[in-house]
């Protein structure tokens, strides 16, 4: 199935049914009072997050979604039946905005979460509501109100804990295969990864995280070159970025340090907040060097990069170093979770102190 991460659709709620102007017509009651019932409410359109979906491709076949109209009111004070709601399944991680105004409507971040995107109209009132001491036979009624109608822009941003960043052919997809059950396409040429891939990495009982592999970046990506820039947004919700570098490129003209600097520059041009995210350096393909040459090669790379953060030496193909990397990532994410909980508790305590005793 083709990966589709943006789409525009049309949603229309159901209009409310009209109220009814009716009078009692019974034997021996020639001039019965009003008995017109109310119209039914129109159905609304909802979006619902479904963890079983991972693309917006289904919207290629259907772009307009309409809820049911409310039925009109009837005599004998019978109310019209309300219209059925329309529910549309979307992948978890979908961002919803108004396609015409750009206004953000909401995000669907949890399985089963629902978002109202087009409210149905209200049913009109029947003439029974307009009876008064001065108007015993009102012919007034109100029509149902119109429902919301709007164009929506849906944008899928994958939910992952960890994002992989790097040049084409750096070995990101091979790393995903090495540490997870995902099986992205792997081959010895650039741009093998054409769409983002997600993998679940398990490091023990009830301990796992989600990793996202996006297409590789090239110089000029922030201006639209290559394949990766359109998928950089999928790293926006990650908490940790692994910068994968081909430490031993087969092309002698290719410089790993120059490649790394280009990636960092493109990242900064795309998003300052993403560039400031915690980033670990992962030096891949070191198994291509004789063991006695590896330390000197790594030290030279780190010195030229002026890198002072975490660094890992791995071979994604053989699996060397990948288990330790996955374990350390899991430990770091758990520390982040604990830090977030503590920060939330501090914020709640400070809020209670500001509010004072009741």
Curated annotation (Swiss-Prot):
SUPFAM superfamilies in the record: Obg GTP-binding protein N-terminal domain, P-loop containing nucleoside triphosphate hydrolases
Domain annotation Obg: ranges: 1-159
Residues the record lists as binding GTP: 166-173, 191-195, 213-216, 284-287, 315-317
GO molecular function: GTP binding; GTPase activity; magnesium ion binding
Enzyme Commission designation: 3.6.5.-
Biased composition range(s): Basic and acidic residues: 341-358
GO cellular component, one term: cytoplasm
Segments forming domain OBG-type G: 160-334
UniProt keyword annotation of Nucleotide-binding present: yes
Region (Disordered): 337-358
Keyword Hydrolase: yes
TM region(s), chain numbering: none
Enzyme kind, highest EC tier: hydrolase
Keywords assigned by UniProt, alphabetized: Cytoplasm, GTP-binding, Hydrolase, Magnesium, Metal-binding, Nucleotide-binding
Binding-site positions, Mg(2+): 173, 193
Compartments in which it is found: Cytoplasm
GO BP term (any one): ribosome biogenesis
Cofactor: Mg(2+)
Summary of subunit composition and partner proteins: Monomer.
Function: An essential GTPase which binds GTP, GDP and possibly (p)ppGpp with moderate affinity, with high nucleotide exchange rates and a fairly low GTP hydrolysis rate. Plays a role in control of the cell cycle, stress response, ribosome biogenesis and in those bacteria that undergo differentiation, in morphogenesis control.
Record-stated family: Belongs to the TRAFAC class OBG-HflX-like GTPase superfamily. OBG GTPase family.
Protein name as it appears in the record: GTPase Obg
Species of the source: Alkalilimnicola ehrlichii (strain ATCC BAA-1101 / DSM 17681 / MLHE-1)
Gene: obg
């Amino acid at each position: 199935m083709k990966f589709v991460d943006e789409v525009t659709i049309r949603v229309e709620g159901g209009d409310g049914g009209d109220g009814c102007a009716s009078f009692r017509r019974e034997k021996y009651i020639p001039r019965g009072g009003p008995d017109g019932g109310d119209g039914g409410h129109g159905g609304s359109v909802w979006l619902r997050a479904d963890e079983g979906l991972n693309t917006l491709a289904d919207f290629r076949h259907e772009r307009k979604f309409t809820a049911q109209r409310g039925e009109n009111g009837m005599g004998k004070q019978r109310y019209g039946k309300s219209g059925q709601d329309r529910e549309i399944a979307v992948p978890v991680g979908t961002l919803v905005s108004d396609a015409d105004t750009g206004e953000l409507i909401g995000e669907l971040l949890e399985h089963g979460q629902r978002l109202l995107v087009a409210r149905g109209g209200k049913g009109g009132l029947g003439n029974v509501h307009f009876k008064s001491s001065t108007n015993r036979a009102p012919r007034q009624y109100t029509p149902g109100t119109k429902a919301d109608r709007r164009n929506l822009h849906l944008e899928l941003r994958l939910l992952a804990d960890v994002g992989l960043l790097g040049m084409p052919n750096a070995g990101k997809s091979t790393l995903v295969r090495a540490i997870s059950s995902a099986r992205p396409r792997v081959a010895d040429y650039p741009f093998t990864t054409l769409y983002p891939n997600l993998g679940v990495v398990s490091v023990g009982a009830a301990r796992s995280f989600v990793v996202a592999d996006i297409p590789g970046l090239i110089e000029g990506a922030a201006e639209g070159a290559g394949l990766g820039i359109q998928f950089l947004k999928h790293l926006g919700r990650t908490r940790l970025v692994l910068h994968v570098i081909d430490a031993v490129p087969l092309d002698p003209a290719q410089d790993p340090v120059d490649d790394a600097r280009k990636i960092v520059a493109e990242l900064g041009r795309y998003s300052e907040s993403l560039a400031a995210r915690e980033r670990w350096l992962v030096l891949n393909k070191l198994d291509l060097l004789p063991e006695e040459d590896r330390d000197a090669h790594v030290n030279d790379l780190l010195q030229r990069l002026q890198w002072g953060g975490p660094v890992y030496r791995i071979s994604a193909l053989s699996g060397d170093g990948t288990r330790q990397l996955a374990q350390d990532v899991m430990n770091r994410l758990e520390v982040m979770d604990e830090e977030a909980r503590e920060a939330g508790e501090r914020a709640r305590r400070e809020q209670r102190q500001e509010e004072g005793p009741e």
